[in-house]
Amino acid sequence: MHFIPEKLDDYVVMHSEEEPELLKQLTRETHQKILQPRMLSGHYQGRVLSMISKLVNPKNILEIGTYTGYSALCLAEGMQKSGELHTIDINEELYDFQRKYFDKSIYGNQIHLRT
């Protein structure tokens, strides 16, 4: 099911940055193991979040609603080297899943997860 015209979707695909391998793995595992995988930010939204973060180059980021951590990892891409990302989620059952992917990334020590 397409929510935007197929030609527009094709254009976005052709002109978007490649999705990092870690995020591809996170997407795959989210769809395999987690309820409501459509809540995942996804490739294109993630690249937009990454681009905005790189433009702003924040020292601190607060994210409310972590889900499986996709958007947090995208936002972390533009964070200053000494920066911190604090992400808060109500679902404590996802903590281990989120932490696993944060720790696989180069931002693991900078991402602080609260439930």
Feature-to-residue mapping (PLM):
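Alpha-helix boundary/capping and short turn/kink residues
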Residues: 17-20, 35, 58, 84
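Beta-strand-loop-alpha "switch" segments that mediate conformational coupling across diverse proteins
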Residues: 26
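N-terminal auxiliary segments of SAM/dcSAM-dependent transferases
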Residues: 1-20
